[in-house]
Amino acid sequence: MDRYPITGRSLEWFFDIDGDLFERQYKRHLSGYRQWKGSSEGLHAERWRVFPHNIGPHLSIDETSLSRGELYTIVTNKEARGRKNSIVAIVLGTEADTVIHALRQIKSGLRNKVTEITLDLSESMHKICRMAFPRASRVIDRFHLQRLALDAVQEIRIAH
């Protein structure tokens, strides 16, 4: 039970309790959620979260839509290969200045250890990488290059 997250509802049968009430009580009193939400970290948590301990020499940055059309910029450690501790930062939106502000919460010594960052062709992503990771080499994502090449071949094929 210690290794895997469980819901309060799954405890109903074992302990003869109201699972929904238990979850509410846990959130309000036991978890420290209210204190965290009022802390310096919790104040900006709805806009961005940064995990400096997950940073590594090889990062990737991309935007994605998680829910309801909201775009997020996500910076991941490539060496973690999508497993635990792979997210370095997640920022609501793709505006360069907002993402740069969030990434600058990571100490510059850690950011300067990044040697390579993979990104797409977006100009805002280039600006983010240039400002937040000045010593990192920027590598264009293979998917975007393949798409450009296929589009060019398609144009030539149609023209002839």
Residue ranges and their predicted role:
Residues 1-6:
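Short, amphipathic alpha-helical "recognition" segments used to contact nucleic acids or chromatin
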Residues 7-27:
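Short, basic interhelical loop/turn and adjoining N-cap
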Residues 15, 26-37, 153-160:
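Short, well-ordered alpha-helical segments in soluble proteins
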Residues 18, 110-113, 135-136:
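Secondary-structure boundary/capping positions in well-ordered alpha/beta enzyme cores
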Residues 23-128:
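RNase H-like nuclease fold core
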